[in-house]
Each structure stands twice: as C-alpha cells, then as structure tokens.
Amino acid sequence: MSEENMKQPEEVVLPPAGSLLLSTSPHVHQGESITTIMLKVLICLMPVVTASICIFGLNAVLVLLYCSAFCLIFEYLWNLLLKQPQTVKDLSAVLTGVILALNLPASAPWWLCLTGSFIAIIIAKQIFGGLGQNPFNPAAVARVALLIGFAGPMTTWIEPMQGFTATEIMTHPTPLGEAQMAAGTEGAATAFEQLESTDGLMQSFLGNIGGSLGETSALAILLGGIGLIVFRLIKWQIPFAIIGTTMLFTWLVHTVDPTLTPGPLFHVCSGGLMLGAFFMATDMVTSPITHRGAFIFGVMIALITCVIRIWGAYPDGVSFAIVIMNALVPLIDRLCYKRPFGWSPVSASALQMRRNEVK
C-alpha cells in the first residue's frame, strides 16, 4: 500500500461545550422581521394616507394621529400592566391605528378614535395573546363594533375639501347609500345610471366623494395593493378572488334585475371593498395559509359583502364579511391542507387505531 493510503485519518475536533444551539424548525430564515414587514405595509399605505389628507385635509390628519397614538398607548399600557416585553417598537400597533383610521369618517371625534383603538388593541388583539395569536382582524372588529354601537358618528360624512380644512357635513348618503335607498324603486334605473356614469365612476375611482378615509380613492388603494404584491407581503389570491367574485356576482344580479343594484364597476370602486381586499382580508395572521384556502376565503368574503350590500341593513358589509370569515379560517385550513403522499382515509384510520393501542 502507498504511504498516502496508510495515513491515519485526522482527529475530529468538536466545538466547545455550550457553543452549539439546538432549535426546532424552521431553520431557513428569509431575513424579514416583524418590524420590517410592518414598515413595508405602512409604506404601501402611504398612497391611501396621502389621498385621504388631500381629500379631507386637517380632519384626516387628526383622525390618523388620534388612532395611531391611542393604539400605541393601549399597547404600551397592556404590556406594562402584564409585565411583558414592550412591543410598541415593532410598529404593529401603529399599523393597526392607521388601518383603523382609514375605516373611520373624517368627522370622527377623538373619543370615537379612543373607543375604536381600545377595541382593536385590547379586545381583538391582546386578550387573545397578542400579535400572531389573534383570530380576528383588529381593525375590522373595531369598525364592526363602532358601526353597531355608534351608528350616528360612523355615518356622518364630510364633503371633499375645498381648501385645507373641511367642515361641511354631508346631508346626503355615500354612493353606496344612494344605491341602497334607490334599489327596488321606480327611479332605481335613473339613479343607477347616474351612479354608473363615467363621471360618477371617475369620482369614486379618484376619491372626490364622501365616506371613510380609506374608501374614497380606489386608485390610491390600488397603487398600495400593487406594492403589497410586489413586496410579496400578501397572497394575491385573496384580493383577486374578492374583486373578481364581486364583479361576477353583482353583474349576475344586475342582469337579472337592473333595479336591484348597480353594475360591477360601481361596487368595486365604491365603499371599503378595495381597502378590505388589499389591506384587511390579507392579514397574515387571520387569513388561510394555503393558496387554495386563500382563494376560497376571498370568494366567501365577496359573496357575504354583496349579500349585505344588496339585501342587508348596512350599505357596506366588507368588515362584517372579513370578521365572519376570520372565524372560519381554521376550518378552511383544515379542509385545504395538503395531504402527504400516499395518504388515504383507510391508512389514516389504521394509523389512528394503532396510536390508540399504544396509548
């Protein structure tokens, strides 16, 4: 044998004791943190925030500041009282505050912002264990609660501003409210024709209408939504399913009875559909984990929203639909879970019987 083959193997030197860390999966890290994810979502919200300020002026600034500040305060106080590590720096409370503000009218008083922030942070988030453990979208829960408990302030609109301040209270409903009141009447066709006119749709698309801060400019929301998809922060199946199903369902209803509801473009550009589709229903914590589940989730949100808009008591039902479907996310995940290769009901039953025997 040659000298090389006769050489003894080198001694293996183990690392010092305590230098190796054992941890559970996943071991592959994308490099994203909670703070960076929240920051990216906030950046994507900037077109919507900017549009709301341009449309409603100082009133929008105050509502945004109130909700953001109150959410931060409640987050800080909860962690302080329970002696938990502070989470105010991860920007999740700020994001909740901004989305909540976009669900409120520009005329919302400070106490309404305070109540909504308490519901969003304490009731809908922290009581369930904090970020990552809340089953419902905090902003959607807060909006639903405020609509039920404080319908007056929640439906008091301000006209789009003429200067930097807007103080004129609307004496007529939003486009969705007009459509709901006209539905089924003799003048429904004329009212719907006006709402669906090029000028009417452009007003809704650009934001020159009354309503909540985040439901007036579909263009601004669309720009922010594209940013979310580019950053890969959301599953595109959810907004695609919501918008597509809404257009299909309202087209069918409008075709069957033109006096019951306006056409699909009106429904997409009006109300909180776009905001809910891109920034609320796509919440990572409260949406399904599979692509098929996300699509089903979006379809059901759209159907519930359309049913409430056409036959319900409220002009818009996006937040109601999101909260209802949040409760069904565990069921959707269970039904859409990918079975391992070779799985069958027989093998699963046999395995369960074997497990019971071992116990």
Region annotations inferred by a language model:
Residues 57-70, 107-116, 204, 208-218, ...:
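Structural signature of hydrophobic alpha-helical transmembrane segments
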Residues 73-84, 121-132, 223-232, 278-287:
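C-terminal ends of transmembrane helices
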Residues 92-166:
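A generic, well-ordered mixed alpha/beta core segment in the N-terminal half of proteins
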